Amino acid sequence: MLPRAIDFHVHLPTPDWLDGSMAGYVEAAEAYFRSPVQRSTLDDLADRYRDIDVMAVLLAWDAETATGRPRVPNETVADACRAYSDVFTGFGSVDPRKGDTAVAEVGQIAAAGLRGVKFHPSLQAFAPDDPVYWPIFAACQEHGLIALFHTGTSGIGAGQPGGQGIRLDYAQPIRLDPVAAAHPGLTIVAAHFGWPWHMELIAIALHKTNVYLDISGWSPRRIPPEVTRELRGRLSGQFLWGSDFPFLTPERCLAEFDALDLPADVADQVLRGNAARILRLG
């Protein structure tokens, strides 16, 4: 039986991500989200999600080449998903700038039972529309893995001189259009709906049904009305609910999503139905 909701965007609130991969970035992100990150053990995280009847999609992380910071290994997420299989599923991550190593790791992610691959073009400093990276996306398609891309602005580096060297243009949604066109069998999820280029992403999703949008990283009550209009209407089958924990809490995101007062069938699609379909759950 499916849970009440599936949180499509959950980072590990543990030291390996917050103090390792995110070292030097957390303070700016906390200021951007106007909220302290909530640190947690995996035991406590699992209990938290059980208590609200939500499944969490845990995300690995690998931006070693661009940031010089350690990765969250795919094995860490796979182990957590096995240990807490009632409440966690997960995505691996590859560093696109590692070339053939990244391509090989896609197969390892699939073999580990993970459901997709997480990319952060701005932190990984790569342009998804550069065909040099397309063997990675072809491998995702071959193995039936979802490709989840950060899109739009980023709380990481926000409000800092030079944005801590992080380029937002790498995460502009239009860069995903040629990827989706060249890989029609690849399910692409554009996280955070690409603001401030959200209309660009809406156009892509209307044109290409293999492109989905997640609403994580946003207080639902602050989602732009043009995005909410498409969520209620033409794109209700391509939106995914998520929190971006530990920056925003699932409890808050659920409560504010409920307050949007969507039709029951649309709310169910966005909260769990669309995610369950592309994750092949239930």
Task: Enumerate the predicted regions with their spans.
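Mid-to-C-terminal alpha-helical segments outside catalytic/metal-binding sites
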Residues: 1-51, 55, 107-108, 235-240, ...
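Conserved, mostly hydrophobic/aromatic
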Residues: 9, 77, 81, 90, ...
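A cross-domain feature marking catalytic cores of carbohydrate-active enzymes
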Residues: 10, 60-61, 92-96, 119-121, ...
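Active-site environment of divalent metal-dependent phosphoester hydrolases
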Residues: 13-16, 63-66, 96-100, 153-157, ...
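Short aromatic-enriched loop/helix-cap "lid" or pocket-rim segments at secondary-structure transitions
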Residues: 16-22, 70-71, 103-105, 159-162, ...
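Alpha-helical scaffolding within the catalytic cores
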Residues: 38-46, 72-78, 102-104, 173-176, ...
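Active-site gating/metal-coordination segments in enzymes
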Residues: 55, 63-158, 167
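Catalytic pocket-lining loop regions of alpha/beta-barrel enzymes
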Residues: 115-116, 129-240
